[in-house]
Every structure is written in C-alpha cells, then in structure tokens.
Amino acid sequence: IITSTVKSTLMGMKTVEQIGEALNFKNISTLTVEEHDEMIGFLSQLTHCIAVSLMTCKESSDLVDYTGDSFRDLTRIARINENMWSELFLLNKEELLLQMNLFLERYFK
C-alpha cells in the first residue's frame, strides 16, 4: 500500500511503486490516508482487538488441549508486540472506534 501525503511527490510515489514491482509484490495499491486508515482499522486493528479480548475474557489454560487452528491463530495475533499495537491504536483511534461500533452493531443484530 502506497499512501500519498502532502509531502509526496509524483516521482517519489513512482519510485516506491517500482520498488514494489522489483520485489514482486502481488498487489500494489495507492490509497488516500483516509482509505488506508479505514482499511487498516477494519482488517488489522479490529481483528487484533477481538483477538486480545478473546484471550483475556476467560481463563483458558485448561482448554489448551482442545483448541483448534482458529483459536491458536487468535492467540498468535493477540501476543504480537503490545507496545507497538497500543501506539497504532492511538494513532488511528477515531477510525478504530468507528470500526468497533460497526462490528458491535452487526454482532447484536
């Protein structure tokens, strides 16, 4: 994902795209800051919040022998660098809260 800011130049954006192509990136997209924040808020940050919530809402040490791949995936996601995630959540707070509210609206329907 290439995100343009007010400091970005066309040449700089093209250079970043060419680097992605040289590295054989499968998808190279240019998004606005708002599009990026919305997508990351939903796909990454909301997912992380849900994973952490599931890992902390119930003592699950006695359930370890019964877990499947999806639960193990959630524990892996929940354990990722909490200091980094805290900073990312604060930087994208408004969008993350919006995504949480949308999720909860659908959940309770």
Model-derived segments and spans:
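Internal alpha-helical scaffold of NAD(P)-dependent oxidoreductase catalytic cores
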Residues: 1-77
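Interdomain hinge/lid region at the active-site interface
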Residues: 62-109
